Amino acid sequence: MKTLLLTLVVVTIVCLDFGYTIVCYKRHASDSQTTTCLSGICYKKITRGSSRPEMGCGCPQSSRGVKVDCCMRDKCNG
C-alpha cells in the first residue's frame, strides 16, 4: 500500500510540473515550433515592415518600430 501511495505522489509531481515552466511558440523566419520556457514568459515581437512576427521565451524590450507583447500562459504568443 505504501508503494502504491508513493507511486501516486511521484506521478502527481511529474504531471503537475512544479517547475513553473510554460510552453511558448518559437519562430524565427519561416519555421514555427513550440519550446518549454523556464522563465515562464513568452513574447511575440513584430517589427514594422516584417511579414512574420518573431516568437520565443523571455520578454525583450521594445524599440522604435518594434512592438513586443509578453504573456505568461501556455502558447499565449501564437
Curated annotation (Swiss-Prot):
Domain of life assignment:
Eukaryota
Q: Does the keyword Secreted apply?
A: yes
Q: Where is the signal peptide?
A: 1-21
Intrachain disulfide bonds: 24-42, 37-57, 59-70, 71-76
Keywords assigned by UniProt, alphabetized:
Disulfide bond, Secreted, Signal, Toxin
Please describe the organ and tissue distribution of this protein's expression. Answer: Expressed by the venom gland.
> Where does this protein reside within or beyond the cell?
Secreted
Q: Name one GO molecular function term.
A: toxin activity
A Gene Ontology CC term for this entry?
Answer: extracellular region
UniProt lists the family membership as follows: Belongs to the three-finger toxin family. Short-chain subfamily. Orphan group XII sub-subfamily.
What name does this protein carry? Answer: Alpha-neurotoxin homolog 7
Q: Which organism is it from?
A: Micrurus corallinus
Q: What is the lineage of its organism?
A: Eukaryota, Metazoa, Chordata, Craniata, Vertebrata
